[in-house]
């Protein structure tokens, strides 16, 4: 199968200088390496164009208008030629064989994606319900296991299924939780996601997202976490629990009302991606009780 590696970037020149060449060298299985640039204002494109002289399989998709992480990724996946797509943040440093060690899983047609092991960081792969929300905790770190979601910055996925399921939902703009949401849609549609401990990458957590004010990042995380519940959960009892705990959070801190209103406003902007419903909410949760 042909493989495309997509590295998303926005004003990440320093990160590209540190890690892009390592991505190219440690991705010999890839037929193309795509730099998906989201209208950077620094010299990212100048640097990558110079690097293209050395690596013929390095390509550029450059947006003239900033679109946000989800749209940038979706557009690059549509234009990629590979049957398998490797998604990497610009601050990912992959180890040797990180792609190779994941490929055998795709012999199973039910498996549509595999998450990489981020060295030094927990794989928050197990899904459960608590306090009115979908929550996640680490899975086993030494063996392959199912994963509730795949990180949008360190995973490999079947291109056709990524597009079939609607890619990353724009409702989560500008970022956060779009990959978690995609994972929920994949499981609901009857597909399987895995986490592979031998596919090792180092996530340096130097992303350009960190340039945003901390207060704004917390707000977006809270809003999008709520959206992920309202967008995906259909069980009436679980939704009732969410309403009860949301009310309790409002009583303990009125700022949460702003988050609820913002979430509903965002939901009205974007239609829900259409996908099949092979599994119920409780069916999915039961898978992760084992």
Residue ranges and their predicted role:
Residues 22, 37-46, 65:
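A conserved acidic beta->alpha catalytic loop
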Residues 22-30:
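Short, acidic, metal-binding catalytic loop of nucleotide-sugar glycosyltransferases
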Residues 62-80:
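Glycine-rich, basic loop-to-helix element that forms the pyrophosphate-binding segment
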Residues 85:
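Short aromatic/hydrophobic "clamp" motif used to bind/position activated sugar donors
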Residues 92-128:
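Conserved donor NDP-sugar-binding/catalytic core segment of glycosyltransferases
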Residues 116, 129-148:
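Short, flexible, basic/aromatic active-site loop/helix in glycosyltransferases
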Residues 148-166, 171-200:
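A short, conserved alpha-helix in the catalytic core of glycosyltransferases
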Residues 234-290:
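Non-catalytic, C-terminal membrane-associated alpha-helical segments of glycosyltransferases
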């Amino acid at each position: 199968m042909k493989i495309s590696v997509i590295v998303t970037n926005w004003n990440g020149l320093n990160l590209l200088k540190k890690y892009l060449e390592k991505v190219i060298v440690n991705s010999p299985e890839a037929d193309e390496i795509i730099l998906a640039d989201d209208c950077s204002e620094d010299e990212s494109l100048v640097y990558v164009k110079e690097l293209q002289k050395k690596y013929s399989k390095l390509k550029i998709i450059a947006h003239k208008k900033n679109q946000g992480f989800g749209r940038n990724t979706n557009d690059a996946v549509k234009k990629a030629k590979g049957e398998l797509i490797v998604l990497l943040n610009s601050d990912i440093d992959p180890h040797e064989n990180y792609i190779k060690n994941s490929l055998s899983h795709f012999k199973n047609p039910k498996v549509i994606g595999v998450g990489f092991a981020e060295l030094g960081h927990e794989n928050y792969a197990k899904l459960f319900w608590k306090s009115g929300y979908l929550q996640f905790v680490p899975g086993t770190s030494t063996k392959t296991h199912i994963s509730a979601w795949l990180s949008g910055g360190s995973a490999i996925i079947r291109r056709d299924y990524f597009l079939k399921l609607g890619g990353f939902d724009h409702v989560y703009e500008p970022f956060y939780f779009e990959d978690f949401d995609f994972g929920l849609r994949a499981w609901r549609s009857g597909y399987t996601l895995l986490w592979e401990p031998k596919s090792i990458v180092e996530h340096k957590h130097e992303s350009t997202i960190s340039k945003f004010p901390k207060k704004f990042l917390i707000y977006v995380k809270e809003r999008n976490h709520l959206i992920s519940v309202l967008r995906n959960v259909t069980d009436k009892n679980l939704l009732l629990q969410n309403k009860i705990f949301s009310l309790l959070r409002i009583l303990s801190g009125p700022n949460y009302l702003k988050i609820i209103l913002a979430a509903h406003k965002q939901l009205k902007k974007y239609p829900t991606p259409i996908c099949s419903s092979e599994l119920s909410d409780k069916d999915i949760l039961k898978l992760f009780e084992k």
